[in-house]
A protein has these predicted regions:
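Conserved alpha/beta-domain cores
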Residues: 2-282
Length: 282
């Protein structure tokens, strides 16, 4: 397993100190491509330095090889955020909450040619910048072998064409359902890091429509789910970040930090407020 986002000087004890947790938390700008053709998707917020970017390209449509379109998307981000670490996610093939058979990696495994194209583009990007891969909607430990086979086929193709790449890049999972939280230890045995997505957990645990915020009782349930995910990751020695509305909730930051959140995956417009809140906590 590859180490991911770990501090340069680990604490001597097994339990991380509060100071270490605060020092190691990372802010990640999320760019999930939902933009019209010709519009630049990458607009860094003013006054914030971005060290890590999470990128989800649009599903490929029309003419052009999917691999080249993914690679062009990632390469542009690398040029805009020169020196930043890139966390690359494949696009959803069918982001419909009611159709679990086509969500995340399940849908991508059914469209293996597209999934392999993503892996090839991601590994090619690793020759240009420090890179990680983040897989969406992984909730079943038995999916790991099929995902690995898909990645291995992509690597063999790159080797055949003598493309440069880093084969050791970390691969993580996005935890989006209560089931994934409950079987977190089995899932994390196969992956290098995790990101708990509060928006998806709200949708599946509380049946909330997209964009609707939970009641205080529902919010407490979500905090317990994300904290369980963080604690499981800590026991397994894995990095765990938080995405969704909880990551941008400045009032929740002290509690997330206390439970060992290693990173906050945020829309770019939320970065200034969260940066200010973190500075006050420190």
């Amino acid at each position: 397993m590859q180490q991911f986002f770990l501090p340069a000087e680990p604490a001597a004890s097994k339990e991380p100190t509060e100071q270490l947790r605060r020092a190691s938390i990372r802010q990640v700008a999320e760019y999930n491509a939902r933009f019209a053709g010709g519009t630049r998707p990458f607009r860094p917020p003013r006054g914030c330095r971005i060290d890590t970017v999470c990128l989800t390209p649009p599903p490929p449509t029309g003419a052009g090889a999917p691999e080249e379109r993914f690679f062009a998307f990632f390469r542009e981000a690398r040029e805009v955020f020169d020196g930043a670490e890139l966390i690359l996610s494949p696009p959803e093939t069918a982001p419909v909450r009611t159709d679990f058979s086509r969500r995340g990696v399940r849908g991508l495994l059914r469209e293996s040619a597209l999934f392999e194209a993503f892996f090839r583009a991601a590994y090619r990007t690793s020759a240009l910048a420090r890179t990680s891969i983040l897989l969406p909607f992984v909730s079943d430990p038995t999916e790991a072998d099929a995902i690995r086979r898909c990645a291995e086929r992509a690597l063999r193709t790159l080797l055949y064409h003598r493309e440069p790449f880093d084969e050791t890049i970390p691969i993580g999972i996005r935890v989006e359902t209560p089931a994934a939280v409950l079987c977190g230890r089995q899932l994390l045995e196969d992956w290098d890091f995790a990101v708990a997505d509060a928006d998806s957990l709200a949708a599946f645990a509380l049946a909330l429509p997209q964009g609707e915020r939970p009641t205080p009782c529902g919010a407490e349930i979500l905090r317990e789910l994300t904290e369980k995910c963080l604690e499981t990751a800590h026991v397994c020695g894995r990095f765990c970040g938080i995405a969704g509305f909880l990551a941008a909730d400045t009032s929740a930051l002290p509690r997330l930090i206390a439970h060992g959140a290693g990173g906050l995956f945020l829309p770019p417009e939320a970065l200034p407020a969260v940066s200010g809140a973190l500075a006050k906590i420190r």
